[in-house]
Amino acid sequence: MDDHKTASPPRERSYETPPAERPITDAEAARAAALSANEHIKIASGYLRGTLADGLLKHATGAISDDDGQLVKFHGMYLQDDRDLRAERTKKKLEKAYSFMIRLRIAGGVVSPKQWLALDEIARTYANGTLRATTRQTFQYHGVIKSNLKRTMQAIDAVLLDTIAACGDVNRNVMAATNPAQTGAHKAAYQLAKTISDTLLPKTNAWREIWLDGERVVGGEDEAVEPIYGKTYLPRKFKIVVAVPPSNEVDIFAHDLGFIAILDKKNKLKGWNVTVGGGMGMTHGETDTFPRTADVMAFCEPEDALKVAEAVMTVQRDWGNRKSRKNARLKYTIERYGLAAFRAEVERRVGRKLQDPKPFRFESNGDRYGWVEGEDGRHHLTLYLPSGRIKDVEGGPRYLSGLRRIAEVHQGDFRLTGNQNVIVANVPADRKSEIDALVAEYGLNLGVTALRRNSLACVALPTCGLALAESERFMPGLLTELEESLAAHGLQDEDITIRMTGCPNGCARPYIAEIGFVGRGPERYNLYLGAAFDGSRLSKLYAEDVAAKDIRATLDPLFAAYARDRQPGERFGDFVIRAGFVAKTINGPDFHDRTGALKAVA
């Protein structure tokens, strides 16, 4: 891949003047300014309390109020229902089969064996019997009913974990590089992620009051209760990652804020390149919404990284769009006011000028499977988890039971990756054989083909309320079909990134996959092609509203052309652009421009 050295050259255009005031926190003023409904909910919430405590006591329903449904996200939960059962329950005049998805906050994705065992027990006791590793280095539970919410949260708290700010208009879970070979750099990345996570955590006591029956803390001025966020928190979600080249397994260009480790020849940290303005979500048919890859804005010294993180987030707090949530992410803020103005304001808040970015190079955004020895002599085993779902498969791998057994004997830690996989980390050399025996006994090393190890899928149906099509449940069968097609053209060992989401919000980051599927409706998908293998370039729409049954037939001629006409070492995403099947996407606003994407497959 090309070296990434500087921010994208600015397009010649005029930008708006940034606002000079802090966000509106008065209810009357918010109404007069026509702020979004969520802003009113936050203002009236009493720092994220709302009526959640009372709603939990209403046993006649498995749901909570609509306003509390927005606030509970800040506590790490989404209200969902089983969409497979909707029609049947409606016919019987029953309430929807409500339950909650619970997402943990695990900075850097590191958990101890003790914590793993506790999380496993929670899954089997209160959730649907599975754990799900997410695309952002944490766990989700599905199927937790309202009456079990407090018990679940208290069990999570008992092993020194929580779900605070795992969702909502706040800084979300902070990701960090997991590359096990670069032990020192990984430690620096993890420490920065953990420090940022702790510093930017909401300070309201609402989570402990509601879920742990803690004593209510009397509120005061905004600066006392929430010194960073204030009463209205952020305009929208905010995601931070820390990467260590040459691996981009955290997909740094897909996030609001990123730190890229700049290392010397001895792999010692010199500082961080700072990226801003990435994000995946969009809305079908609305071209003023788009995914965007982050700009490489500047370089900062190690001691300034935390100040930069807080400055970037608070500029977004003050400048972000609070009228239209679809245009509220940092990517739109930078498009609206310009990168130069944004950097200048960040520097003003940091109190010093930042340096220009340093050269760096990413080579891939996938995981390194199997055993890897770190610089410190410890060993790390990366295991593939299909779509991140940790469960026992009948007649196949027993992920839940096998990882439970490993946790019972493991003396190191576990690391979740941004690709929905898990690393059994920090294993002494003399304990490798014990881990290998358990991996073999439970079949945990089965089915890791080239295509599967580069695949991601969101949960989608039946639990996600936003899903327009299947994803996790459909992906395995589709991969089998596409593997057959690739093998027919001698491409079975080619690494090609492939991702699927059930809606355009892009949780599995499909717009930076070489092959991306985005749900349009039941069994129908938009097909995107042409992203960079290292995650640094967006894809382009190749075919719209493709029936699920036609996906293989649509891609097979492209695989044939790739096998026949590719250049040495050429990646699939680069090939489809050079061959003229799709136009190259420069960045976000260019995403919807399909000019040049009209070549028919020979």
UniProtKB/Swiss-Prot annotation:
Pathway: Sulfur metabolism; hydrogen sulfide biosynthesis; hydrogen sulfide from sulfite (NADPH route): step 1/1. GO terms for molecular function: 4 iron, 4 sulfur cluster binding; heme binding; metal ion binding; NADP binding; sulfite reductase (ferredoxin) activity; sulfite reductase (NADPH) activity. InterPro entries: CysI, NiRdtase/SiRdtase_haem-b_fer, Nit/Sulf_reduc_fer-like_dom_sf, NO2/SO3_Rdtase_4Fe4S_dom, NO2/SO3_Rdtase_4Fe4S_prot, NO2/SO3_Rdtase_4Fe4S_sf, NO2/SO3_Rdtase_FeS/sirohaem_BS. One of its GO terms (cellular component) is sulfite reductase complex (NADPH). Disulfide bonds: none annotated. It catalyses: hydrogen sulfide + 3 NADP(+) + 3 H2O = sulfite + 3 NADPH + 4 H(+). Its EC number is 1.8.1.2. Keywords: 4Fe-4S, Amino-acid biosynthesis, Cysteine biosynthesis, Heme, Iron, Iron-sulfur, Metal-binding, NADP, Oxidoreductase. The keyword Heme applies. Residues 1-15 have a biased composition (Basic and acidic residues). [4Fe-4S] cluster binds at residues 458, 464, 503, 507. The keyword Transit peptide does not apply. Binds 1 siroheme per subunit. Pfam families: NIR_SIR, NIR_SIR_ferr. PROSITE patterns: NIR_SIR. GO terms for biological process: cysteine biosynthetic process; hydrogen sulfide biosynthetic process; sulfate assimilation. Siroheme binds at residue 507. Residues 1-24 are annotated as: Disordered. It comes from the Bacteria. Its cofactor is siroheme; [4Fe-4S] cluster. Component of the sulfite reductase complex that catalyzes the 6-electron reduction of sulfite to sulfide. This is one of several activities required for the biosynthesis of L-cysteine from sulfate. Alpha(8)-beta(8). The alpha component is a flavoprotein, the beta component is a hemoprotein. Belongs to the nitrite and sulfite reductase 4Fe-4S domain family. This is Sulfite reductase [NADPH] hemoprotein beta-component. It comes from Methylobacterium nodulans (strain LMG 21967 / CNCM I-2342 / ORS 2060).
